[in-house]
Regions:
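Flexible N-terminal pre-Rossmann segment of NAD(P)-dependent oxidoreductases
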Residues: 3-4, 60-70
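An N-terminal boundary/leader segment
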Residues: 1-45, 51
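General beta-strand structural signal in soluble alpha/beta enzymes
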Residues: 74, 114-117
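Conserved amphipathic alpha-helix within the SDR
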Residues: 56-58, 91
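Long amphipathic alpha-helix in the N-terminal Rossmann-like dinucleotide-binding domain
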Residues: 48-55, 111-112
Length: 129
């Protein structure tokens, strides 16, 4: 079953009807990210932590939030405590933030699962005359 083009609403229905578990959904998300590795669009994979969180969500059977158990990829400019955040910059290539950005905190407190951070490419800064 491919989840690649499913909406959050469709995934939520699948979770509610127990067609798929959060752990299976998170695993499928990591498989898709691995399949797209050649595109070089993901900076940091959060596989172990995200699989563990999905197992906890499955055990707790939390469906109070629409995002509960839904895997998300976040842009590589939002800090997540303990997850390498580079902003696609060489100077930040090994930066592990000691805090989590408010936006990420709100998503995670709603039950979403951060699976990967994807590239943040800036526009060229060369001046065009």
């Amino acid at each position: 079953m491919s989840i690649q083009f499913k909406t959050i609403r469709e995934l939520r229905e699948m979770l509610d009807k127990k067609v798929i578990s959060s752990e299976e959904l998170t695993g499928e998300t990591h498989k898709l990210a691995e399949d797209l590795k050649d595109l070089n669009c993901f900076v940091t994979m959060n596989k172990d932590v995200s699989i563990e969180k999905s197992k906890l969500i499955d055990q707790a059977d939390k469906s109070a939030s629409v995002l509960s158990g839904i895997p998300l990829a976040q842009k590589d400019l939002f800090c997540t405590e303990g997850l390498r955040t580079t902003c696609s910059s060489k100077i930040l290539s090994n930066f592990i933030p000691p805090y989590t950005a408010t936006a990420v905190m709100k998503l995670e407190s709603a039950g979403s699962i951060t699976t990967v951070s994807y590239t943040h490419l800036t526009l060229p800064t060369k001046r065009i005359v």
